[in-house]
Amino acid sequence: MRPSKRAPDELRKVTLEKGVARYAEGSCLVTFGETKVLCTASLEERGPPWLRGSGKGWVTAEYAMLPRATHERNRREVTAGKPSGRTQEIQRLIGRSLRAVVNLPAIGERQIVVDCDVLQADGGTRTASITGAWVALHECFTWMRGRSIISVDPMRDHVAAISCGIHKGIPILDLDYDEDSAADTDANFVITGSGGIVEVQGTAEIAPFSEEQFLGLLRLAKAGVAQLVALQKQAVG
């Protein structure tokens, strides 16, 4: 039995609530069990300087954790002068994941910044961020189309992310903090609605895992992402 008492292939309770931020062009409050992330998408009329004249837009992301998102207060990274290596890795992952399903020329020479702020962390903050960020970005595109800023929907597909791991030899889906801490292996999968793999991050904590075990985790992740995509569809109507 896994620490959370869930079945090996069972997600935590996941909710996706759009339109929670009054001023953002798109927003979503995403929860994976006790992990809660606020995702907002903001339209900037100017794209990055290096894309000027290309006719192409850009989607990027920023990620942060509130000081008391964890058991003990963490110092705000702004007071340290720069984001940590972990923060930079995660926000780049979120940006890559979103761009994988966006037709960038359809945005025009504009930039959309998706901010993912962790309100409470209990494992899987990066996977929750990607899943909620897609909803926020979708809402931003809907807002833009409603005001004739763009004429076509730039979103080509869904994208969501989920963690998997091996706990006492058993593959499990959607690890919370306690499970992640005790897992023999943990991995994050970013997968599109059509089943395309955007990114895989996997680490053996105790002993190497086999190809067969990896494929088992992949199958588990694909099934989990299919459930998340269904929830995204429900959230955006």
Swiss-Prot record:
Give the top-level enzyme category.
transferase
Catalytic activity, reaction form: tRNA(n+1) + phosphate = tRNA(n) + a ribonucleoside 5'-diphosphate
Record keywords: Transferase included? yes
Ligand binding (phosphate):
R86, G124, T125, R126
Q: Does the keyword RNA-binding apply?
A: yes
Q: Its Enzyme Commission number?
A: 2.7.7.56
GO BP annotations, alphabetical order: rRNA catabolic process; rRNA processing; tRNA processing
Task: Could you list this entry's UniProt keywords, alphabetically sorted.
Answer: Nucleotidyltransferase, RNA-binding, rRNA processing, Transferase, tRNA processing, tRNA-binding
- Entry-linked PROSITE patterns: RIBONUCLEASE_PH (PS01277)
GO molecular function terms listed in the Swiss-Prot or TrEMBL record:
3'-5'-RNA exonuclease activity; tRNA binding; tRNA nucleotidyltransferase activity
The family database entries (InterPro entries) matched by this protein are listed as: ExoRNase_PH_dom1 (IPR001247), ExoRNase_PH_dom2 (IPR015847), ExoRNase_PH_dom2_sf (IPR036345), PNPase/RNase_PH_dom_sf (IPR027408), Ribosomal_Su5_D2-typ_SF (IPR020568), RNase_PH (IPR050080), RNase_PH_bac-type (IPR002381), RNase_PH_CS (IPR018336)
Q: What domain of life does the native source organism fall in?
A: Bacteria
Oligomeric form and interacting partners: Homohexameric ring arranged as a trimer of dimers.
The entry assigns this protein to a family as follows: Belongs to the RNase PH family.
PANTHER family the record matches: EXOSOME COMPLEX COMPONENT, EXOSOME COMPLEX COMPONENT RRP41
Q: Which NCBIfam families match?
A: RNasePH
| Function noted in UniProt | Phosphorolytic 3'-5' exoribonuclease that plays an important role in tRNA 3'-end maturation. Removes nucleotide residues following the 3'-CCA terminus of tRNAs; can also add nucleotides to the ends of RNA molecules by using nucleoside diphosphates as substrates, but this may not be physiologically important. Probably plays a role in initiation of 16S rRNA degradation (leading to ribosome degradation) during starvation.
Protein name (database record): Ribonuclease PH
The gene behind this protein is: rph
